[in-house]
Design a protein with these regions (language model features):
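Single conserved hydrophobic/aromatic residue that forms the stacking wall/gate
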Residues: 284-292
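PLP-dependent amino-acid enzyme catalytic core
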Residues: 2-285
Length: 292
């Protein structure tokens, strides 16, 4: 009888440990001399970096005793955090309610429903502020309900400090000069930055935000088309002390760079990934030759 020693008990055990890949085709196309390496978070079970956050926030709430078995989790989100939370909540037996503007796509709603989430739509004109208010109203009405608050929850950034950053350091054998990430909640860039700078304080950390809404640099909040980053406010988790540079990326350039990852690498990536790649390849950011 064959014994399978590495069979996961459930999908939560497959979160993290995502591979790194050199963007060799993209680098050749633009004559870039440095090694640009992408961390393929799409290899997570629900398809994004937010799987890490969903698991971390739920396990943290369990450990603190605020989330009881079978309880209701509420979160205002229209993005991949909702997908990650839905997957983990289903596995762990929680009821998940997601509040989001009615302007969100039918496809996104159907995906979340398929994963077991209950969708509560709010006035589209009120944006995410309306969804946040609705989440608080539901929490106050439902006994034992918990809002995980991804923009404020320290376990969000801690997940990236303990996993994402450490994985990058390990899998590059410490050959990292610059780390670039978009800012939505701020958890990825700041958490990973803390881990990397513990190993080497000279690693240069770049935060990416939409040029249309450059709030991290003190600019005015405004609509933009880079889904997944640019919350139009400075998140509580964003720690400017670990960020060396903020690069604003135009919407059209982020979209184009995302498409070029597909044509140059066969890599299907979102607009926020395109923004990060643009920040590396279309700015004055300089990296030492033959380093990541």
């Amino acid at each position: 009888m064959m014994i399978m020693a590495k069979i996961a008990k459930n999908l939560t055990e497959l979160i993290g440990g995502t591979p790194l890949m050199k963007l060799a085709g993209y680098s050749r196309k633009y004559g870039l001399q440095q090694d640009i390496v992408a961390k393929l978070e799409s290899f997570n079970p629900a398809g994004s970096v937010k799987d890490r956050v969903g698991l971390a926030m739920i396990e943290d709430a369990e450990a603190r005793g605020v989330l009881k078995p079978g309880a209701t989790i509420i979160e205002p989100t229209s993005g991949n955090t909702g997908v990650g939370l839905a997957m983990v909540a289903t596995i762990k037996g929680y009821h998940l309610m997601l509040t989001m503007p009615e302007t969100m796509s039918i496809e996104r709603r159907n995906l979340l429903k398929a994963l077991g989430a209950e969708i509560v739509l709010t006035d589209g004109m009120a944006g995410m502020a309306g969804s946040i208010a609705k989440a608080k109203e539901l929490r106050d009405r439902i006994p034992g309900a918990v809002i995980l608050q991804q923009f404020e929850n320290p376990s969000n950034a801690k997940a990236h400090e303990l996993t994402t950053g450490e994985e990058i350091w390990r899998d590059t054998d410490g050959q990292v000069d610059v780390f670039v990430a978009g800012v939505g909640t701020g958890g990825t860039v700041c958490g990973a930055a803390r881990a990397l700078k513990k190993h080497n304080p000279d690693i240069y950390i770049v935060a990416v935000e939409p040029a249309s809404s450059p709030v991290l640099e003190g600019g005015e909040a405004a609509p933009h088309r880079i889904q997944g980053i640019g919350a139009n406010f400075v998140p509580a988790l964003y720690d400017a002390s670990v960020v060396d540079e903020v690069i604003p990326v135009p919407d059209d350039e982020a979209i184009r760079a995302g498409r070029e990852l597909a044509s140059a690498e066969g890599l299907l990536a979102g607009i926020s990934s395109g923004a990060a790649v643009y920040a590396v390849s279309y700015t004055h950011l300089t990296l030492p030759t033959n380093r990541e």
